[in-house]
Structures are given as structure tokens and as C-alpha cells.
Regions:
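Fungal secretory targeting signals
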Residues: 1-33
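Proprotein-processing/basic-patch segments
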Residues: 183-216
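Juxtadomain low-complexity/linker regions and immediately adjacent membrane-anchoring helices
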Residues: 20-59
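Beta-strand-rich interaction/scaffold domains
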Residues: 111-179
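A short beta-strand-loop element at or near the start of a globular domain
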Residues: 57-110
Length: 216
């Protein structure tokens, strides 16, 4: 109960201001149901293939506290029209001429031991930033990375018990580059979401990138 009270106090910082005008709704390419039985069958890493990439840095920002740097976290937080979390991912050189698939894995409480809070209608937006840019521990709402491509789509719902493909396409890493940093901010107009990003507590939860050969 004490933990819940602390998180509830954090969520109470949301004051109902509008989300950024350049925020783009999440593009859900496909989804698949996760069943209760999957937790017992999920090895370490769950259903993620070998080599799946997880965020290298996650930084919350707040529209109501636009100059406050909250620093790195493994517990992303999203609140209605206030807190967003920026996710950095680094694409290695092995992604050259490959397909990158951005997934959001969202198991139910019965499928993961990772604690999370989810409350609301489940609408989220994802604002992309320019390639080779991303958040730093000092990033705030007022000094976000420069804008970049975002997956255009109608409003989408993320709900527990599902695994979502947010976007899939060329990795775009130039030939000869050792790596390329990509990033984006997850926000919501109507939903509280706080979770522990992990792939080691039953089924994995959070954002991941899977690199694969392009389909012919």
C-alpha cells in the first residue's frame, strides 16, 4: 500500500494541460493476444528473439514542470497531458539494409512479475525525434531533441495482455556508421501508465526493436 501511495502521489502531478501539437498517434501495425499460459512458457527474454534491442536510456519529461530534468529511469511514466517518457534506442551497424520492428510488449499482470499501473482509456501518442539524436540525463520538456519522423496513424489503444508492432520498416542506418541512435516520446491524453521496463520477470514488458532480414 505504501508503494501504491507513492506512485499515486507522483501521478497526481498531472494537471490536465494539452499534449504537444506535433505529437503523432501510435501506429499499430498488428497485435496478437498473450495468453495466461505464456508466463510459464516464457524463458528469460520472453518471446523476444535473440539480439532484440531494449532502450539504452529512458527519461521522463513534464509539461507542467518544463525545466525540471528527472534523469534516467527504468520506470517509464506517462500521465494525461503532463508526463511523457523519451526512449532512446541504438541501432548497430548490423542493421544496415535490414528491417527494424519497433514493438511495445504489454503483458497482463498474470503474464509478468514486473509491477505496473495502468488506468484510463488507453490512448497514446508517439513523437519521433531526428535520427542520431536522443534524450540525455539533462533533457527536459523545454529542451527535447529535434523533431523527426513519426509513424502517422489514427488514435490507437494500448491495453494489457497484448504485444504490439508500432512500426516496421528499413533501419535507415547509413553504410559505414557504427551505430545510429533513434528516439521518441510516449505520451497520453487520457491514461496513467507506470511500469518497470524488463525482459527478465516473466514475459517482457516495454519497448524493444527487433532487427530482421527484409521480406522479399
Amino acid at each position: 500500500m505504501k508503494t501504491l501511495a507513492v506512485v499515486s502521489a507522483l501521478l497526481s502531478l498531472a494537471a490536465g494541460l494539452a499534449i504537444p501539437e506535433d505529437a503523432t498517434p501510435l501506429e499499430i501495425i498488428s497485435s496478437r493476444p498473450l495468453t495466461i499460459e505464456e508466463r510459464s512458457s516464457c524463458p528469460k527474454g520472453g518471446d523476444l528473439p535473440k539480439g532484440a534491442l531494449q532502450p539504452t536510456l529512458m527519461v521522463p519529461i513534464s509539461k507542467n514542470l518544463p525545466d525540471v530534468a528527472f534523469g534516467p529511469t527504468w520506470n517509464p511514466i506517462v500521465t494525461p497531458n503532463d508526463f511523457c517518457t523519451i526512449f532512446n534506442l541504438v541501432i548497430p551497424s548490423s542493421g544496415f539494409n535490414k528491417t527494424c520492428t519497433l514493438e511495445f510488449l504489454f503483458p497482463s499482470h498474470g503474464q509478468t512479475f514486473s509491477p505496473y499501473i495502468y488506468n484510463g482509456a488507453g490512448h497514446f501518442t508517439f513523437t519521433g525525434y531526428a535520427f542520431f539524436s536522443g534524450a540525455t540525463p539533462e533533457t527536459t520538456y523545454n529542451n527535447q531533441p529535434p523533431p523527426g519522423p513519426s509513424p502517422p496513424s489514427p488514435p490507437a489503444v494500448l491495453a494489457p495482455g497484448n504485444a504490439y508492432v508500432i512500426n516496421a520498416g528499413p533501419c535507415f542506418i547509413p553504410e559505414g556508421e557504427a551505430s545510429m541512435e533513434v528516439s521518441g516520446a510516449l505520451c497520453s491524453p487520457d491514461t496513467d501508465l507506470v511500469y518497470l521496463q524488463t525482459e527478465n520477470m516473466g514475459c517482457p514488458i516495454g519497448f524493444y526493436v527487433v532487427i530482421s532480414d527484409p521480406e522479399e
